[in-house]
Curated annotation (Swiss-Prot):
Protein's UniProt name: Putative ribose/galactose/methyl galactoside import ATP-binding protein
A GO-annotated cellular component: plasma membrane
Keyword Glycosyltransferase: no
Organism this protein belongs to: Ralstonia nicotianae (strain ATCC BAA-1114 / GMI1000) (Ralstonia solanacearum)
Subcellular location: Cell inner membrane
Primary location recorded for the protein, binned into one broad class: membrane
Residues reported to bind ATP: G61, E62, N63, G64, A65, G66, K67, S68
């Protein structure tokens, strides 16, 4: 299967005029001619960036464009191969993340780095704990400091709760509070809203505006255009490891940014084709999981894309996990082609032709220390490529390479560790893993979370093509344009129950939000 995206070379006339260059006195952070290479990949090539005091500077670019690599260099995680970093006009050499923190640079990573079995307060003040006269940790003072920090940021989380008990969104807020606690001059946020609800995003933006008013320089990596126009003063675009340009957010349009990011025009963001809808493949009736969701009923047909919408905590992901046997339902009925089945494990679900892309690629998707081949073959090795106890390595590698090309995975090759890839390319590998199983039913939980605009269009085109081949698709998404643009019908959930199923022709953002808040 091939993915077609109309490419048009970008000319200089497509690029908006650059914003004014910041003066030396208000430049908090400057990057000059930085380059960085990894085995087989040039991650950064002569990159330049300036961040002014009291501004939010957004970074935009496709996955693999070099944004996160540059931020890790600024935060002391990686050392540049060449180039220079300046803080307040003075050149610096960073000798690790702790050195960067001591110099006033804090970073909130895209993949959260909290200790799950430590409390919230312990995570925030780790290696900076207040101590009593005996040299022991003063837990009362630790709690007081955390409460004061949370009060300042309007965060409602118990300081003594273990991090492992928190939702992903709450963990993200703890990471943000931890970064703020260092009182850093430069704060780097890498996709900070990827797991947040709309309410939590607005809360985060209030915090960012507060920090901006205090004169902080904030670097904000995002793929979301709406966020750029709402919160950013300036933005820089990266493409293929190079800085394309810096502009005032008020000077450009959405189409300008897309052309700068991908170097081409994307003619159709949601290429949903009208395909014949077949017979019911999956029928769910009164499915329940005690304390999580109840009485969930719906049908899914061959060739149909059934979108699932709802606010964070509505139970959407839990239903997907129950269908795939990750956390089996406590009651209810699942039928495949009219036959009642019991799905208690993922292995059983796979035997019935089901595939499941989880929402958390780091914890439940990728084997981070293994290469692309191992990650892609994980679901098919024993079932499709074993003969008399021997693995048909040639056929396996050939199919994985073909899938990698189809999905346009950017990597040095199949033997590159997946942890070295950008989040978007990791997501493509996981999608490839499940497509190799040739599923009849494909469950996608946030398939384009953390994906750049070009890759989103490719994945949307792929999903539409799969539906055209008769695959039944259940697609969970928190992005309203994606749900409205890609779905034949939309099932809406609120507090663990289905509040309505809307046909494509009757669906609107207002209608879906009404059902999601019932």
């Amino acid at each position: 299967m091939s993915i077609a995206v109309l490419d048009r070379p970008m000319s200089r006339q497509d690029t908006p005029s650059a914003s004014s260059v910041p003066s030396a006195c208000d430049c908090m952070l400057e990057v000059r001619g930085v380059g960085k290479s990894f085995p087989g990949v040039v991650a950064l090539d002569d990159v330049r960036l300036r961040v002014r005091r009291g501004t939010v500077h957004a970074l935009m670019g496709e996955n693999g464009a070099g944004k996160s690599t540059l931020m890790k260099i600024i935060a002391g995680v990686h050392a540049p191969d060449r180039g220079e970093i300046r803080l307040k006009g003075e050149p610096v050499v960073l000798h690790g993340p702790l050195d960067a923190l001591n110099r006033g640079i804090a970073m909130i990573h895209q993949e959260l780095n909290l200790m799950p079995y430590m409390t919230v307060a312990e995570n925030i003040w780790i290696r900076r704990e207040p101590r009593n006269r005996c040299g022991l940790v003063d837990h009362a003072e630790l709690r007081r400091r955390t409460q004061a920090l949370f009060a300042r940021l309007a965060i409602d989380i118990d300081p003594e709760a273990e991090v492992r008990t928190l939702t992903v969104a709450s963990r993200q807020m703890v990471e943000i509070a931890k970064a703020v606690s260092f009182d850093s001059e430069v704060l780097i946020m890498d996709e900070p809203t990827s797991a947040l609800s709309d309410v939590e995003v607005h809360h985060l933006f209030r915090i960012i505006r507060q920090l901006r008013e205090q004169g902080k320089g904030i670097v904000y990596i995002t793929h979301k255009m709406d966020e750029l126009f709402e919160i950013a003063d300036e933005f820089s675009v990266f493409r293929d490891g190079k800085s394309i340009g810096t502009h005032a957010a008020s000077d450009v349009t959405r189409d300008d940014i897309i052309r700068m990011m991908v170097g081409r025009e994307i003619t159709q963001m949601f290429p949903k084709a009208d395909v014949p809808i077949g017979d019911v493949v999956l029928s769910v009736k009164n499915l329940c999981l005690h304390g999580v969701f109840r009485d969930v009923s719906f049908d899914l047909r061959a060739g149909e894309i059934l979108g699932v919408a709802g606010l964070v905590g509505s139970g959407r992901s839990n239903v997907a996990e129950a269908l795939f046997g990750v956390v089996p339902a406590s009651s209810g009925e699942i039928r495949l082609d009219g036959e009642r089945v019991s799905i208690r494990t993922p292995a059983q679900a796979m035997r019935y032709g089901m595939a499941f892309l989880t929402e958390d690629r780091k914890d439940t998707g990728c084997f981070l220390n293994l290469d692309l081949l191992a990650n892609m073959e994980a679901a098919v090795l024993q079932r499709h490529y074993m003969t008399c106890g021997f693995v048909r390595r040639g056929a396996l590698k050939q199919d994985c390479e073909a899938m990698s090309r189809t999905l346009r995975v950017k990597s040095p090759g199949l033997h590159e560790e997946i942890q070295n890839l950008s989040g978007g390319n990791q997501q493509k590998v996981l999608i490839g893993r499940w497509l190799l199983t040739h599923p009849r039913i494909l469950i996608l939980d946030e398939p384009t979370r953390g994906i750049d605009v070009g890759a989103k269009a490719e994945i949307h085109r792929l999903v539409s093509a799969l539906a055209g081949e008769g695959v039944a698709v259940l697609m969970i998404s928190s992005e309203m344009p994606e749900v409205l643009g890609m779905s034949d019908r939309i099932m809406v959930m609120h507090e663990g129950r289905v509040t309505g199923i809307v046909d494509r022709k009757d669906a609107s953002q207002v209608r879906v939000m009404e059902l999601a808040s019932r």
